[in-house]
Amino acid sequence: MANVKINNISARQILDSRGYPTIEVQITLSNNVFAKASIPSGASVGKFEAVELRDHDTNYYHGYGVTKAVNLINSEIGQKIIKLETLDQEKIDNALIEIDGTNNKSRVGANSILAISLAVAKAAASTLNIPLYQYLGGITAKILPTPLINIINGGMHADNNLDFHEFMIIPHGANSFEDAIRMSSEVFHTLKKILKQKQYNTNVGDEGGFAPNIKDNTEVFDIIIDAIEKSGYKVYKDFSLGLDVAASTFYKNEKYKFSDYQFSTHELVEYYKNIVTQYPIISLEDPIAEEDTLGWKMITKELGDKIQIVGDDLFVTNCKLIKNGIDNNMANAVLIKPNQIGTLTETLNAIRLAQKNNYKVILSHRSGETNDTTISHIAVAVNCGQIKTGSLSRSERLAKYNELLYIEKLLNTSAIYQGML
């Protein structure tokens, strides 16, 4: 279908799940097909992420407004993108990068660029009358990802005393994605009952997981395992656990301080070795601070052949940083967040680089989300087999899970559930 071009670009300011402004873009094509995309924002931001453009006017949304970005899209950027061929995603993304002209997208903002990039892809898929996952991945796109479900929130994602950001359940023993969500929902609601019985609060954090004040991390593991078993499931067989440590948030002066303890890098790695032995933990995300290169090499050497060691802040969806990690044996898995890099093309390139070098890939949301479900489609398109998109409460999280349930139905008998990581 040749010569379907971008006819109009319209941006507006909306609110994300934390009540902060973000961008929504609508692309209208020359055949009158249109599509919208909206952009998330993170609470824990890696030092090397592409830069969001914010207004920084403290009298307007406390400085978090995005009217500058919206105005740029509706004027300068839009004028240069209109009339480009919709089906040439790479050309459009390269044009957006060129318009910005910086190495970190700080002039027009990664949020501006990504909103356009994703909306273009959605419009192209609609033009061809196929789902986005099929447009991006073709007929080989058929693996439904195992969800890493953030069942208890801590760190910067919750107003409680837990140091680690996310305590996750991983339903690798399910027979289908639908089965995985059902099993996880049962554990989620059982966990709520257990927390109430122990007189912990059951308020939820930014990503929909419970946010109780539990002093000891090991008690959190014990409570989650209790919820799994009381739901009729077995650890290791049906569920295992994952952690997003976000170690950079408590790393200072070459020391790690949490739970009233101060650790050297070596001591922290020993701590991880101990809990991985004691508990069914099969995935550690950002267990080491992004600048602690020796620590990353150490933990990968000690645990990399046993569990998944995930780099988020270490890699920030950036091919250059991923290659550096591969060359230096740091981590064995890459977390992918499109807004860390700013275009769909760069996101897909980062995924391909990781997969080519046998690094596992996990598609991920951000703490400040919208109801946009693009990451669900990307996860299936690239057959990465894993997705992180929060807990089983808050509609912006469930939107992604519900979209994957829909994709599984579309794929019908072709659908394959990833299962074990």
UniProtKB/Swiss-Prot annotation:
Chain positions recorded as (2R)-2-phosphoglycerate binding sites: K337, R366, S367, K388
Cofactor binding description: Binds a second Mg(2+) ion via substrate during catalysis.
Originating organism: Ehrlichia ruminantium (strain Gardel)
Metal-binding recorded as keyword: yes
Keywords: Cytoplasm, Glycolysis, Lyase, Magnesium, Metal-binding, Secreted
UniProt name for this protein: Enolase
Cysteines paired by S-S bonds: none
Family: Belongs to the enolase family.
Any one GO CC term of the record: phosphopyruvate hydratase complex
Cofactor(s), names only, from the UniProt record: Mg(2+)
Organism ancestry: Bacteria, Pseudomonadati, Pseudomonadota, Alphaproteobacteria, Rickettsiales
